[in-house]
């Protein structure tokens, strides 16, 4: 097994660590999958604990950051950094430890992009905060922000990089399919975080 394959496997396994679930148990909240949307990500954890939600967001982001860091240590290929990020996100979405039922990948995406292009993270957060302040839908804000960053990657990176990022974006949008259906039917819950 070559080093690229090792990094990809490690990226998936790191991404698979279910910090939202672990922190919820440590914090005495029990199984977060039985609360709200049933998701293990920061948004669902927020419904029970703001502090644990922040910790979940940061740790899920670190998963992406570490995966890209490993890619950059062992390869100078920029596209490989995107691939490692994608496998970390896949791990977060489909963790082997939880029968492949995980989160939606936004925090892990942001963490991975910190080392690829931090300015895109700033753009993502600006758009997310703006849309959330207006509509109060975390899912809508995440989807639109991800699409915008995909356009930035297309404008400033190679076609190979863009292809990988589009694949990541499609995975993220697919993970939000239930949210999209609820928004279209007017049944999506708004989230109040003080914005």
UniProtKB/Swiss-Prot annotation:
Question: Mainly localized where?
Answer: membrane
* The reaction(s) this protein catalyses: an acyl phosphate + sn-glycerol 3-phosphate = a 1-acyl-sn-glycero-3-phosphate + phosphate
Q: Where is the signal peptide?
A: none
Task: Give the superkingdom in one word.
Answer: Bacteria
InterPro entries on file: G3P_acylTferase_PlsY (IPR003811)
Spell out the SMART domains in the cross-references. Answer: G3P_acyltransf
| The keyword DNA damage is assigned to this record | no
Q: How does it sit in the membrane?
A: Multi-pass membrane protein
Give the GO biological process terms: phospholipid biosynthetic process
Q: List the GO molecular function terms.
A: acyl-phosphate glycerol-3-phosphate acyltransferase activity
Residues annotated as transmembrane: 3-23, 53-73, 80-100, 115-135, 147-167
Keywords from the named record? Cell inner membrane, Cell membrane, Lipid biosynthesis, Lipid metabolism, Membrane, Phospholipid biosynthesis, Phospholipid metabolism, Transferase, Transmembrane, Transmembrane helix
The text of the family note is: Belongs to the PlsY family.
Q: What is the lineage of its organism?
A: Bacteria, Pseudomonadati, Pseudomonadota, Alphaproteobacteria, Rickettsiales
**Quaternary state and partners of this protein?**
Probably interacts with PlsX.
Q: What is this protein called?
A: Glycerol-3-phosphate acyltransferase
Pathway in which this enzyme or protein is active: Lipid metabolism; phospholipid metabolism
Q: What is its EC number?
A: 2.3.1.275
In which compartments does the protein localize? Cell inner membrane
May I have one GO cellular component term?
Answer: plasma membrane
